[in-house]
Each structure stands twice: as C-alpha cells, then as structure tokens.
C-alpha cells in the first residue's frame, strides 16, 4: 500500500510539473521564436555555452567511466584473485556528538564488515565519550569477531574532527603497517553496506598510487522528506562528477563519509597536513581550516604525488541530520560549509600546476571559481531584459529553465539513481541559492563553522584587524556584485 501511495504521489507530481511546463509554453508570445526577433537572439545568448558544455563533458566522461572504464578495472582485479588481497585493513571511525542509535548502526556495520571481509583487520575507534566506548564494547561482545579482527580505542579531547583523525592516524602508525596495508577512514554517521570492503581494497593492487572515496547514498530515517530529496539530488550529481574526474584519476575530493588510502596516512607530513592545515590569504591573513578535512587530505595526496579514484559500485549509507528544521535555513548552512571548503581548497589547488593536475582538472578547478557568476547569468539577464524590453523574455527563460532541468533530471537517472518530480526544482534551487552562497563565502573564506555542533573558528584577532576583515569583505562583495550587474545592464 505504501508503495502504491508513493507511486501515485510521484505520478501526480510529474503531471503537475508537465502541466506547468505546457502553461508556460502557451503563455510565451510567438515572436520569441522568430529568428528575426532580437528577443530570440537574446534567448540564444542566455543558454550559457560554457556552463552547459562543461556539464555535457562531465556527463559523457562519467558515463564512459561508469559503463566502460571501471568495469575493465573490476575485471582485471577479479582475475588477480587472492593476489589482490591486502596484508592488513584498518577501519578507522571518528565519532563525536552522534546519537546512540546511529552510533550503534555505524559500528555494527563496521564490525560486521571486518568479520565478513576475510582480511586481517583492526577497527580503530576515535571517540570522545565513554558511553560510545561502552556501546562499541557491547557490540563487539555480541558479534564475537574472530582472532584476526582486533579492536583499538583512541580517546580524544573533543577539540574537533581534525584532532580525532590525526590521533587515529598516529594510532595506526604504531601498528607499523607495511606498504600493502590499507586504511579506510569512516565518518561517525556512515553505515557500511555489505561487501564494501571487499569491493574496494583489492583495487589498490592494480592502482598502487591511489586513495579514493566510495559512492554514498542517504538513509531516510534521520530527516524530513524534502531534506532527503535534496541530498539525493546532490549525491546523484556528485556520482556523475566523480565518475568523470576518476577518468583522469583526479577525483577532486576524498569524501569525509568514507575514503580508502594506502598506509600513506601514517606519513607524518600527511598527518600534519590534516591536523594543522591553514591558508595564507592576501587580505584575511593566515587562518586554520576548521572544517574540510577531506579537502586537506586530498590536497596533501596531490602534493605528495598520489592519485585519486572512485569506486561507483561500493555503496554506503549516511544518516543525515539537517542542521535546522527549516529547509531553506538548513540548506544555506550546509552550502556555506560545502562551498567554503571547496573554495579554500580551490585557491591553492590551481597553484599545483597543470603538470601535476592535468589540463582537464585545471579547467574544472577554474570553472569552480567562475561558476558562482555564470550560474546567475541567465536569471539576471532575464530580469533585466524583462524590465527593459518585455516580460516575454522572462517567460522564455522560465520555459528554458523548466525544460533543461527536466532533461538534466532524466540524465541523472542514467547514473542509476532514482528520480522524482521535485528534482527539476531542486536542481534550479541548488544552482541559484548555491551561487549566491558561494559569492558570499568567496569573500569570507576565514568564516567557518560545523553544522553538527555549534563550533566556529575563533581567530582571536586584534580589534582593527577584525573590523577590517569584516568591512572589506562586505565592500568587496558589494563591488563585485555591482560590477556584475552593471556589465550585464550595459550588454543587454
């Protein structure tokens, strides 16, 4: 019955969306489609060749990797058999201020994977609360793993995830792992699906210079449906983009949910990079990275000469807890953290150079810097054009948005993700609101905060420096936005 209700709800949603699309098409004045009309010429200019060409390239590369290249790697590893087995597997989980129900699910799945994978395995628990330790010990006794599976606790002070990771890495280094050992870093809200370890770690034998993230999906139990839908759209887009970048062995992030490394994590230089990462900014000065440990680990691997890869058939579930009950406020908070981490990495990643990153990766990193403006180009021109000329321009833009987001939604389904009638709206919401948040955070890279706990970066600056950073950020945001709008008003 629930499945029938869901199917009827989805069908109703699609009918409403398609009906709205037809109404917009009917409301569109015929002269908009006249090639002689200046409105038609303007509409063509709104398409945004750069943005859509990058999207098409990512999609084609992603499908090539997903259905051709990755299956080739998988077949090669399967032929190796036992020769692809690692000498030891370390499953390190970091937990802080996560509810007991989620913690139980996470550690239960990790211990089961340690038992079922068949490799010598050590579960490393980087935890703060004694209650977590007691819960893990009770799960350990209940599941009763064999002698080849060990348990190692690392108690941390609760000063942040970076310290938890660094202490966990040092605990692993004390085991003195050899070069064939593999380390999986797992977030405290990540539930491992069955077989994820066996699907992942053997690939290192064929790709000896890699550390990579695993594919992720969302668990519906921890948030409202609209939060879940947004996360599903984001994961579907990330899935295609990661497949595209994996074609160049340059996946641009080692997702904090689950990443797998060679024992390079025991390198003191790598540990310091994760624990005490910082950025020197020409206006804001030097500041530490509070969030974005996954970006720090990616940058460190790139700098140390390693490559990154993606395993699309190794799935995990994440228990997502929205930071706010209100959808818009929660999404803004999450975007502020995501895009802040992205831009803080981006500003220095390009300095690694084309020889290290490759041409395509360098172009993608550049696109990340300009996409905050190109994403707003169509909407801004449509508003200006409708004010200066005719409301028909905005109606044409609305039709274009609905049509293209419908096509994008259908393309997302080719990645193996389910789609729904809300996806076109969510795609556009993410584009516009995401671009605005990105512009805001671009001029405030020193402002960082966690969404799970109320922790913010306190730089303890002198009063003048704090005042200067605050007002210069506002001034630069206003100036950049004014120039953007002025150029478009003169061009339209």
From Swiss-Prot:
GO BP annotations listed: alginic acid biosynthetic process; extracellular matrix assembly; hyaluronan biosynthetic process
Main subcellular location of this protein, as a coarse class: membrane
PANTHER family: HYALURONAN SYNTHASE, MANNURONAN SYNTHASE
Organism: Azotobacter vinelandii
Bilayer topology term: Multi-pass membrane protein
Localization of this protein: Cell membrane
Listed name of the protein: Glycosyltransferase alg8
GO MF, any single term: hyaluronan synthase activity
Alphabetized Pfam families for the sequence: Glyco_tranf_2_3
EC number: 2.4.-.-
GO CC entries: plasma membrane
Keyword Glycosyltransferase attributed: yes
This protein's UniProt keywords: Alginate biosynthesis, Cell membrane, Glycosyltransferase, Membrane, Transferase, Transmembrane, Transmembrane helix
Higher taxonomy: Bacteria, Pseudomonadati, Pseudomonadota, Gammaproteobacteria, Pseudomonadales
Family: Belongs to the glycosyltransferase 2 family.
UniProt KW Protease keyword: no
Residue ranges of the TM segments: 13-32, 47-69, 379-401, 421-443
Pathway terms, separated by semicolons: Glycan biosynthesis; alginate biosynthesis
